[in-house]
């Protein structure tokens, strides 16, 4: 049954795409600290909003998080919509999904970007299902403007020039559809062996989760931070809306590998298979000397040589270190 969960706007219809406007970014915070990926997406969202000629809005959800709105404006947001409520202090799927879907059903953005963090990967599909729209997961590139998208294809694909030049429409339900205002979401497919570009032509908002680290964070602008418009959304939420309760937040004793933020990475791959123990040891020693971290290819992870948080590449984390050393990776 369509839209089984009640939304704040009972007349919401995702197929009436002409009613949707503006680009939104979910600005993820944890314990009052903004996630870096949120600033990356605000910077990317600024580009998309400019291409569409619309506003860029940051969506900030939590408890007493209004003070973070200014920093979101500093990276390019025109407006920050703040959803403040005590039950939003700690992330729970039920509470965040309800509030986000409520505000979207009322304000109707045409595009909604979410960081592909653990929270974003949980939240995105739930919201897309409730809002009866499409979600492209784990994106590494976004475009709206066709000339810009075509330039991207020329540099990132093997498509012939005639094929790229002829792109203007797509077949949707057997009819030609003008893709000029559609968000073009590119992501790895088939285990990272191909890149696929996906559009959501029949419903809005177009939703995408985006890998942390793939979008460039803009320079912070103090003037924009001071000028950002802050709108407080009237959150309607009570304990009955939640099926779970966060009793305590315990930080992991084991520190996860920060590949995305690392300046120096030493990665290992299939080529160390003749001496895995020696290869891994060498990688760690070199990483320690450089003050960096150890990464690995998909083969290294699938073979159990390293844990999944070390994986680099199309099917792992996208990284931008100052120095990247590849051992046994072709």
Segments from the language model and where they lie:
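N-terminal glycine-rich FAD/FM-binding segment characteristic of electron-transfer flavoproteins
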Residues: 1-330
